Amino acid sequence: MLATVGSLLRLRLGRIPCCAPGAPPEVERRPVASLWPRGHPQYSCGGSPGSSEPPGSAEKVHRVPAEHKPSQFDKRILLWTGRFKAMEDIPPRIPPEMIDAARNKARVKACYIMIGLTIIACFAVIASAKRAAERHESLTSWNLAKKAKWREEAALAAQAKAK
């Protein structure tokens, strides 16, 4: 696409759009469709892409809202976030925006739960560390005891080997 646009500009087939800042008012308006290869989107300053009709003259496009069949997980999320009160209340097809909103709300709730659990875990670690300090337990004492045990085992192994 970029190579095509670059070659069009080098051949001076491109034009300065009428809506570009600094464009002179007498810029000739060529049909956009003749400048672009087939299959690529054609945009102009006016209304709809690729047409020279004034904006608003094109027929309105009737858009059918996309419907989505929710999975069991989606249904549980819709219930958990409070969108529906019971599983039977959930219609067979719902808009994807509703599912996205429910998922976002569920993400926020899950984050709040994790924040709460993290704070509770911090207090639990603080309490257990205070109890360990009262018993005079520390990582240093554990490491010294472990190394003393290893030395003792090594000495016993050396005595058994010497016999």
Swiss-Prot record:
Chain residue ranges for the region called Disordered: 43-69
Transmembrane segment boundaries: 110-129
Biased composition (Basic and acidic residues): 59-69
Topological relation to the membrane, as annotated: Single-pass membrane protein
A single Gene Ontology CC term: membrane
Swiss-Prot/TrEMBL keywords: Membrane, Transmembrane, Transmembrane helix
Cell compartments where the protein resides: Membrane
Superkingdom in the source lineage: Eukaryota
Major localisation: membrane
Family under the similarity heading: Belongs to the UPF0389 family.
Record's protein name: Protein FAM162B
Gene expressing this chain: FAM162B
